[in-house]
Amino acid sequence: MPYPNAMTVKLNHTIVHSVDKRAAADFFAGVFGLPAPKPFYDFLDVEVGNEVTLAFLDADGMEIQMQHYAFLVSEKEFDQIFGRVKERGLDYWADPGRKEKGRINRHFGGRGVYFQDPSGHLLEIITRPYEGA
């Protein structure tokens, strides 16, 4: 552990601003094979595991800045998720700059791919954590 006196901090939830929270939450749950979104106040929550929830919220006319969300998945989960990406006819890239269209990367002996959600956020699935990340 590089910081022996550091506190243990876990991400619990984050808000994902969306053009249409229903479309975005349904898209995410569908592509990732997760349970249907659950309403919570003004949000639609999708539980992604590890006690983390993505809380989708309508941006209500505010400009949405693209965010990047990376998910570490098993080889089997990668195949399932990537299969759904291709079934939906989504564009995908090997890089975050979206220059290597239609390719996957093989960083650190794993596989990784980027694709966008309906609001333009860049989603990434990887099978190995990036060293130094």
Positions of the model-derived regions?
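Short aromatic/hydrophobic contact patches that present stacked aromatics
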Residues: 13-15, 45, 68-70, 112-114
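Conserved beta-strand in the GNAT
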Residues: 54-57, 114, 123-126
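Short, charged/polar surface micro-motifs in flexible loops or helix N-caps
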Residues: 50-53, 62-63, 74-79
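Core segments of cupin and vicinal oxygen chelate
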Residues: 8-9, 15-54, 58-60
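Short glycine-enriched loop/turn motifs at secondary-structure junctions
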Residues: 8-10, 62-66, 106-107
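Exposed loop/turn and edge beta-strand positions of beta-sandwich/beta-sheet ligand-binding modules
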Residues: 40, 67, 109
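N-terminal beta-strand motif that seeds the catalytic metal site of vicinal oxygen chelate
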Residues: 2-22, 69, 128-133
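Vicinal oxygen chelate
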Residues: 71-118, 122, 130-133
